[in-house]
Each structure stands twice: as C-alpha cells, then as structure tokens.
From Swiss-Prot:
Residues recorded with modification N6-carboxylysine: 201
Keywords: Calvin cycle, Carbon dioxide fixation, Chloroplast, Disulfide bond, Lyase, Magnesium, Metal-binding, Monooxygenase, Oxidoreductase, Phosphoprotein, Photorespiration, Photosynthesis, Plastid
Main location: plastid
Protein name as annotated: Ribulose bisphosphate carboxylase large chain
Superkingdom of the organism of origin: Eukaryota
The organism of origin for this protein: Lobularia maritima
Reactions this protein catalyses: 2 (2R)-3-phosphoglycerate + 2 H(+) = D-ribulose 1,5-bisphosphate + CO2 + H2O; D-ribulose 1,5-bisphosphate + O2 = 2-phosphoglycolate + (2R)-3-phosphoglycerate + 2 H(+)
Amino acid sequence: MSPQTETKASVGFKAGVKEYKLTYYTPEYETKDTDILAAFRVTPQPGVPPEEAGAAVAAESSTGTWTTVWTDGLTSLDRYKGRCYHIEPVPGEETQFIAYVAYPLDLFEEGSVTNMFTSIVGNVFGFKALAALRLEDLRIPPAYTKTFQGPPHGIQVERDKLNKYGRPLLGCTIKPKLGLSAKNYGRAVYECLRGGLDFTKDDENVNSQPFMRWRDRFLFCAEAIYKSQAETGEIKGHYLNATAGTCEEMIKRAVFARELGVPIVMHDYLTGGFTANTSLAHYCRDNGLLLHIHRAMHAVIDRQKNHGMHFRVLAKALRLSGGDHIHAGTVVGKLEGDRESTLGFVDLLRDDYIEKDRSRGIFFTQDWVSLPGVLPVASGGIHVWHMPALTEIFGDDSVLQFGGGTLGHPWGNAPGAVANRVALEACVQARNEGRDLAVEGNEIVREACKWSPELAAACEVWKEIRFNFPTIDKLDGQE
C-alpha cells in the first residue's frame, strides 16, 4: 500500500491512498477508562504486515476509508478514530496475531447493541487485505454499560419470583420440536411440570406455524402451568416463544402472555435481532415477565476459530441488550463447548466483576457495575448420568434443561421429569455434604436409584450414550 499522492492546490490536501498504520497504529496510546476495547484475531493476506493489518481493522471499523478524503479536515480524527494500540502473536500460529483496538465512546449510540456491532463487526470483516478476522473479546466500559437496562430482572429477582433457592433450576424442551397440535403440546408441558420440573420450553423454531398457532399454544400451556402448580404447590413456568416476523407482532404475543399471568416468555435473540430483543427486554421489565433467550444461529457466527465472533462477545452483548436466561452450551452434551472457555463466559454472564484470565479466554477485566446477571442454560444432549458434572460445572445459578433426556424416558414424560428431579436433588445433597461430584458422581446417581425406580429406568436407557467428538474452537495452546 505505497502512498500515491497528488497535491490539489485549490483545496490544500493530499489526495490518494496512504498506509493505514500512519494514522491508526498507535502503540504509544494509553487506553482510557471510557474506551471500548476489542481483541481481534487477525489473519492478514500474504505480504500485509501485522501493523498495517491491525491498523486497517481499527480504521475500517471506525473513521477510516480506503482513500484520503478532504472532509477529514472538518472533524478531529484524533478524537474519533479507533486505534490499534497493541499487537501480540498467537501461540502456535505463524500467520495470526491478536490486534487490540481502542474505540472512543463518542462513536457509539447510547443503549444500542445494534449500533455498537454495526461499527465493530461491520464491513471490516469483508476487507480484502485480511484472509480472516475474528472478534475474540470486548471490554465494555461502565460509562457505556450504564446506558443499558440489561436483563429485565436478573438472578436474585427470578429466584424470589419462583421461590426456589439452593439448587439449579430444571427445564425441558418439548419434543418433537415441530408437528404437535396445541392441545397435545400442552399435555406434554403438564406432564413434565407435574413430574417435578421448574420449566418447560418452546423449541427455538416454534413460532406460529399451521400445525400450531401461537395463541392456541399459549392458552394450552397456561392451562398446564396452572394445573401443575395447583397439584405440586410449586411455581411453574413455560418459555412461551414470542419471536415473530415483526417487532409489533412479537410485543403482541408478549402482551397476551402477560394477560394470561404466566411468568416467562422467550426470544431467539440472534435471528430476531438486537433491536427487537432490547425492545422485548424493556417490555418484560415493565410488565413483570422473565425473559428466556435462545441463541439459534450462534454457531454460524462463533464456531470457526479464525473468523467471526466468539460467543463470549455475543454473551456480553446479550447481557447489555437484556435477557434473564441464555443457552450457554453444556461441555458434556451434544453441542460444541470447551470447558474453560465455557466457564469463562458463564462468569461473564453471572458475575458483577470478572478479572482478565487468558487461561479461560477472557482478554479484558469486565466491570458490569449494577447490571443484573443472566442465568446460563445448559441444554443439548444431556441426561441423568450428566447431572453430577452439570451440577459441579454450572453450580446453583443455572438452568439444566433436558429435552430428550426427559421425554425419552421409557415410561413417559412425567417419569422422565421425576428421574431428573431425583438425580438433581441427590447431587445437590451430596455436594452439600462435602462429597466430590467430579469423582463420586456416578456412585451418587446409582445410590439415588434405590429410592427412585424412575431414575433407575433412565440410568439403564442412557448408560451407553456419549457425544465424544473433539472441540473445534479450543483456547490457544490447547491443540
């Protein structure tokens, strides 16, 4: 990218192309407390130096363009430009490096994840000088965090609403995910809640299809909730998916859920979009509804190690946009999820203050100030034999969600729910007594089988089920 300039005497500036690093690579820059900081994994095209590639990322995601423009003289680039302030190698990767970029806060609209992402992960990801680009992490400064409402309620408020303490919450996704009539769907919801689960859930692609329109589903699920509550004395819920083709229709569905008196609704936040999600989160806080978030489409964005965006960034964005639960992988189930990386973004979802810890993929210290936390949801290919590991990995402030692991029980839906509840209670009691779930987990489950034929049957059915595939997106240095 050699400079090619000609002087326009009538204007008094040099037109043409100049190297990005001359303006946007500033290793001497000291970051401000108000800057949004980004860590990018950069794979430049052959012949493009790291400093030029890192500067190009900073430029194209902030104030820069491919050529010099005379209107640069009408503003202060020093005030508004992004800056690549540090570059470090990636262990074991000769062609990759991490570029750290600082963005001034004035570049972003207050309270808008949509605007933040449009800049930081916008056109720059198609830049020809880069073979691949991945956003690994963001530091959201408190000054920007305070412009967001965040989760509608948060962990403590949810526990108080449900009157459930001292253990993970239990859920189940109703299967088959598509094709049931509303009445049969409601029957499955009732059986699972009656058997001991706290929640049941619409699958992410259940919206309002010809076989089951949303209003019918909402009505039969509400009936199931009230009937199971009356019979068990426990507060129950079903994640009613309000995701729709327009924001207006989505809010209409949430309004109907509130009128039914149910405790929680659901949204597919990536396919629905951050603008829609933030709008729904505001409605939920104003109207006392909890909000469950599904991350459908996330693997399109986050699964490949060299290009896209890590889920820890999507998790931070969700905490800003708003949600009380979000799916976060399982580590032990059928879906992708490295253990240390998963534990890292689980902390980013739940905790108020998280220290930088590269061993868990956390590039920046994050202070959420007063923003409520989000419950991570473990879901996907899990069953009763996984209960000790899930309890040990995710702890009490989580939702453990068994779809096939409930509805696949040989005796039916309610016995499947009983099996999961007994296994969970046994694991929590054993942990509270000081037993090591990681070492004694299988023994703890077997002991509980003596008191629960439903659990014994579940253990027999799923004793050989494994999902032993290598993790694709491992932390650096784990290959």
